[in-house]
Design a protein with these regions (language model features):
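Extreme N-terminal leader/targeting segments of oxidoreductases
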Residues: 1-22, 40, 178
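Short, well-ordered coil/turn residues at beta-beta hairpins
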Residues: 26, 214, 224-225, 230-232
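Flavin (primarily FAD) binding-site architecture
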Residues: 230-244
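Conserved redox-cofactor binding core of oxidoreductases
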Residues: 105-218, 239-240
Length: 244
């Protein structure tokens, strides 16, 4: 979304240039995942990305994905884990702001999410990198990315490494996004690059029904019959956050 974003009433929209079921704003990890799931559910999907290519902040990240509960990589590396142990650790690590229902869903579905990533082409090497670094300099696929093995957490839940890293030395976010964007581009979803979201469009009841987009100065109005999903969460365009 641009800094000048506003909410425009649908009654002021003279015509819809594009109509779709779901409009996804932002093609980072969240946007690509949303687009893939929406297409899989049978929706027509348009994806908007203000950059000339997708990836966003996700592509420049370390790409470490927190997965557990007994993934194939954990098992092949000799570590036992379960959704319950993962749940107990996350409940302790998240402190007073934890949401038990969300954490339970995250832990219970974690192995399925691993298989989802692999199914979309993301590779993981079943080798444990023992030296904590946050991001291994090797292409090893499993690290301790949190405090699972530290007191007091190792007294609350059985420790297990859960940092899953796509198979490439160094920052793996680029490989993660390369695979997810390639998966999106194999679907009927329509990525629109160099396009920014200028405003959301809402009806008289306040329901968001579309968005106003701008590509190289040309405005287009997109109607989203089933919803607009905002996944433009990257901070790289926020100068204050970059300076911090």
């Amino acid at each position: 979304m641009s800094e000048a974003s506003i909410l425009r009433p649908s009654r002021n929209i003279q015509r819809w240039d594009v109509e779709t079921d779901v409009l996804v704003v932002g093609l980072g990890c969240a946007g690509a995942s949303t687009a893939l799931e929406a297409v899989d559910a049978g929706a027509d999907v348009v994806v908007v990305e203000r950059g000339s290519a997708g990836g966003g902040t996700s592509a420049s990240s370390g790409g470490v994905i927190y997965l557990g509960g007994g993934t194939p990589v954990q098992k092949e590396c000799g570590f036992e884990d379960s959704p319950e142990e993962m749940f107990k650790y996350l409940m302790a690590a998240c402190g007073s702001h934890r949401d038990p229902a969300k954490i339970r869903a995250y832990a219970d579905d974690s192995v399925a999410q691993y298989h989802w990533l692999v199914g979309h082409g993301v590779p993981f090497k079943a080798v444990f990198y023992p030296d904590y670094s946050g991001e291994p300099p090797t292409d090893d696929g499993l690290v301790y990315s949190g405090n699972e093995n530290c007191y007091p957490f190792n007294q609350i839940a059985k420790p297990a490494p859960r940092g899953h890293v796509p198979q490439i030395p160094g920052k793996a976010g680029g490989l993660l996004m390369e695979k997810l964007i390639a998966a999106v581009e194999k679907t009927p979803a329509k990525p629109m690059y160099d396009t920014r979201c200028e405003a959301l469009v809402a009806d008289d009841d306040g329901q968001v029904v579309g968005a106003v987009l701008k590509t190289f100065g040309e405005e287009r109005c997109v109607r989203a019959r089933r919803g607009v999903v905002l996944t433009a969460g990257g901070f790289i365009m926020n100068r204050d956050m970059v300076r911090a």
